[in-house]
């Protein structure tokens, strides 16, 4: 049966080759997420291996976070930007989960996230979720949870206001746009635990910080860490 399955897959690849979501090249058999060339060229930040990194410095100045990490740099016009766009807007949610697994193994290897018990994806408002069909942050969280062997908590935090997209606002207006948009409905599930707040892309950080502040107000004795998939290279890169 496995020989037949392998044959069918081989014929399928011959006529319908799997393409790398970053460069568009053909994916070699056995490749995961991206092709081998792109895997070695990923613009990693290295933040998951160091507590004192640029993202932690920015966030910890505003909220008490234990750890803060970003997996890669968001570079406009790059194939990695297109990968994120695909799982965020084009329905390729499996990409988000696979990227989460990859990211999660880096977090696990660092040893800095070993005590994380619950992973909280930044929620979407139900109207936006209904329109999109899913929340990409949940699939990222699922992938990370596999590597960290932690529980994904999708229900304790909810988005109560459907604020306009942050991209529609100037930098200063984004902070007003996120005020009071989250609520915690099950604080007892968060209290006393080490939580990992997960989102896809951080720009100003206004949305993520609003969510973090809401959690810490509802469960002040929890420990909070943050993991986002990508941050802008121009703001967080060593040469940016």
Predicted segments, located by residue:
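Glycine-rich phosphate/pyrophosphate-handling loop used in enzymes and phosphotransfer proteins
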Residues: 1-198, 203-240
């Amino acid at each position: 049966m496995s020989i037949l399955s392998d044959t069918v897959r081989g014929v399928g690849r011959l006529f319908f080759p799997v393409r790398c979501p970053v460069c568009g090249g053909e994916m070699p058999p056995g490749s995961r997420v991206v092709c081998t060339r792109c895997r070695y060229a990923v613009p990693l930040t290295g933040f998951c291996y160091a507590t004192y990194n640029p993202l932690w410095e920015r966030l910890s100045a505003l909220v008490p976070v234990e750890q803060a990490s970003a997996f890669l740099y968001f570079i406009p016009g790059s194939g990695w930007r297109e990968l994120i766009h695909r799982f965020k807007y084009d329905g390729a949610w499996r990409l988000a989960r696979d990227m989460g697994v990859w990211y999660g193994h880096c977090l696990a290897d660092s040893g800095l996230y070993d005590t994380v018990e619950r992973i909280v994806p930044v929620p979407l408002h139900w109207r936006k979720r209904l329109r999109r069909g899913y929340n990409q942050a949940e699939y990222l969280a699922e992938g990370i949870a596999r590597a960290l062997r932690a529980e994904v908590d999708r229900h304790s935090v909810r988005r109560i206001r459907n604020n306009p997209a942050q991209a529609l606002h100037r930098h200063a207006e984004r902070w007003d746009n996120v005020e009071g948009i989250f609520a915690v409905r099950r604080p007892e599930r968060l209290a006393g635990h080490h939580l990992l707040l997960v989102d896809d892309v951080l720009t100003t950080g206004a949305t993520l910080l609003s969510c973090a502040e809401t959690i810490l107000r509802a469960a002040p004795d929890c420990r909070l860490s943050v993991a986002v998939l990508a941050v802008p290279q121009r703001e967080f890169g060593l040469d940016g």
